[in-house]
Amino acid sequence: MVFTSGPATVGPGMIVDSDLGNAIRTHRDLISGHATYYKKSSEFYKQLSQRLCDASIVLDLFACSLDQVGAAEIKAPVESSGGFMMLGESFESDQFRKCLRHIFNHDEDGNLKMCFDATIEIVTTKDVKICGALGPCVSLRKKNSSVSEKEIGEGGTNMWKLGILTNKTCIAFFYQVGDEQKVQAGSAFFIQFITHYRLGNMGIRKRVTTAARRWVGNHSPEIAAGFDQEAAASVMARLAIHEAERRYARDVIRWLDNMLIRFASKFGDYVQEDPSSFRLSSNFSLYPQFMYYLRRSQFIDVFNSSPDETAFFRLLLNREGVVGSLIMIQPTLFQYSFDGPPIPVLLDVCSISPDVILLFDSYFYVVIHYGSKISQWRKLGYDKDPNHESFRKLLEAPELDAEQLVAERVPVPKLIKCDQHGSQARFLLAKLNPSVTQNSMYTDGAEFIFTDDVSLQVFMDHLQALAVQG
């Protein structure tokens, strides 16, 4: 475990020198090549990753500081070993205490709620080739005939090492259909996962899971019927941040757009050269908007984040399950009003209203947004008046739900309370679909966003136009 309040200033893992006149690196420095120590220190920590893997050691990083500490460089050994990362402001905070207690949670037998020194081996039928894995694992570079020449993430192997294994560990494996011979539709193929792990003092355990599937024809309706758009979005997000580690953000966005156009062209129903005829079935309809919010997310657009924050965001996304990943990609938004119980609303600027409260969950932070009328009534103390009991209950409801969200999640998300038009409202506005901007025809009093970003509707119109081209 590493507990730090600042970056390394000496040694091979040096992040910044001790001269206070030199600022720590930013994303602009990384892009322009002006981050003096970044490449050297990153290489040092990558070499450390292999040593940790060989010794089956897990590295946890607890960083509490108002500035960066070098998490971007240290990310490699933390991620590959399956370690925990926390970025906070103070070691005296409840956030730090909760994260530390979480690490040492144990069962009724006194064993930690995690397994160590794990390996996952994959065995496939001859028509399926293994490309690699993305997640908290390391390739053991053990090749056989089922390993593809194409590598994705930790590839070139059919066996991976995991320093730690919990009930929330999530790894994405990638496969390629072999083209040596044409497979026959209706015939079966198998993928087997063989997992070894050490469970407390109870020795080594072995678990074998075998999945069987049938081959179908290229244009079979079963392909569409079996498509899981939520899981697909989660996997594409991991692929996108994997690409973002090696390419410029604009190139990653272009890659995502090209993949989405191919997807829409293949699975959409349309008359060629007629965008108005374009339709996607219910199994595919949400996928384009997932990609819209992914390309706008902090995982790809790093403009408002430090390198340490970006490393933290990407590390968590790369190990989170489908549900958590979707919240990171497309946050949830609930509306509280006098009209009834809370309801989910569109992640759109039009959802902001003076007489409602919004509860926004982006996984990393939770925002309670008070409309201007609600805020004014609260400042006048109406919630303390027995004659306005319904208003008091309205104020309490989102706070109770927000506390539950914060209590269930580790690392602990930041809780932000803000008023409409207040400075803290930017945390919500930055994630909303800008359907109304400063360039729109809007009515007086309507909420709008100052931005040059395209709205979801404009994005979909362009997608439809490109998908139906010959």
Please report, for each region that a protein language model flagged, where it lies by residue.
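Extended acidic, low-complexity intrinsically disordered regions
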Residues: 1-470
